[in-house]
Amino acid sequence: APGSWSQYLSEKSKNSKILSIDLKDIEKIHNVTHLIGDFLDEKNQTIISNFFEDKLDLIVSDMAVNTTGNKNLDAISTGELSINAMEFSVRNLKKDGSFVSKIFMGSTFNEIVENCKKNFKEVKVYKPPSSRKDSKESFIICKKIR
């Protein structure tokens, strides 16, 4: 559901400054500032960077394209979103910060993992037990910028 990561992070880190961005409005979440807009718009990335006074501890990307039914095309498009979020993270995370992103298994999967390994010291791919077996959805967890 839209905002589920924000909801989770709000509950787990009560004293943190949290900002979410989505193309659509989401239900108000305690301790979360929500920005309606496209993350790929550089203006919005500047707004996000300026919202925080310092580099960040954690950046989470749950972005995905609207699915087309073509699983490989969807994986490629969502992979591009993940790479964009990873590049933003490299510029905005503290040296020991972490980046988590949704990714889909597909033709660009290895490229995304390699890209993350070039920028982070620790990289793991995680498929939640709650994810359906036939789902191509996974998460990449990256820690400590190189």
Predicted features and spans:
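Conserved SAM-binding loop of SAM-dependent methyltransferases across substrates and taxa
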Residues: 1-14
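Class I S-adenosylmethionine-dependent transferase superfamily signal
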Residues: 9, 48, 85-89, 116
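Short glycine-dipeptide loop
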Residues: 14-16, 92-98
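S-adenosyl-L-methionine
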Residues: 15, 21-68
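Short strand-turn motif at the edge of the Rossmann-like AdoMet-binding core
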Residues: 23, 63-64, 102-105, 128-129
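Glycine/threonine-rich flexible loop motifs
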Residues: 67-78
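A short glycine-rich, Lys/Arg-flanked "PGG" loop and its adjoining helix->strand segment in the class I
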Residues: 77-95
